A protein has these predicted regions:
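Short, hydrophobic beta-strand segments
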Residues: 68-77, 81-92
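Acidic/polar, low-complexity intrinsically disordered N-terminal segments immediately downstream
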Residues: 1-61, 65, 78, 90-102, ...
C-alpha cells in the first residue's frame, strides 16, 4: 500500500457491504512466493497524529475484519486484501470518522516491505 491516509466513503442507505480493497504489490526480482501479514498498528496512528496535530483514535476491532495473511505467489505481482467494516454497528454505536484503522504490512522471512510503503490508515466516512 501507499503510506498514507485513505478515505472510504460509504452510503449506509445503499445496502452494499462496506469494504476497502487494499492492494499489495510484489516488486524486484523475487520469483518466489511471499506471504505478507496485515497488522493493526497503533504506532502508525501515533506518528500520524503527532505530525498532523490530530487526535484520531484506533477503531475497536469489533468493527472490522480481514484475513491477516496475503500470499503473493511467484508469478503473481499483485493481490488484494479485503478489509470489511461493520457499518451498521458503527452507525448504531456512534463510531464516527475520528476512529480509523491503522495497518502495517510485514513480510515473512522471504522478503521485506519497503518502509515508504509499509502502512496505511483507513477512515470510513458515512454519507
Amino acid at each position: 500500500p501507499k503510506n498514507d491516509f485513505q478515505v472510504l466513503e460509504y452510503d449506509a442507505a445503499s445496502g452494499q457491504a462496506c469494504v476497502y480493497d487494499l492492494y499489495l504489490y510484489k516488486g524486484g526480482y523475487n520469483d518466489d512466493g511471499i506471504t505478507v501479514k496485515l497488522v493493526v498498528d497503533p504506532s502508525v496512528l501515533d506518528v500520524y497524529n503527532v505530525e498532523n496535530g490530530l487526535e484520531l483514535k484506533v477503531m475497536p476491532d469489533r468493527y472490522f475484519a480481514f484475513d491477516p495473511e496475503v500470499r503473493l505467489s511467484g508469478d503473481r505481482v499483485m493481490d488484494r486484501a479485503e478489509i470489511r467494516f461493520d457499518a451498521a454497528s458503527m452507525l448504531a454505536d456512534g463510531i464516527d470518522s475520528s476512529y480509523v484503522l491503522p495497518l502495517s504490512v510485514r513480510a515473512d522471512d522471504q522478503g521485506k516491505v519497503r518502509p515508504e510503503k509499509n502502512s496505511v490508515i483507513i477512515r470510513v466516512e458515512m454519507k
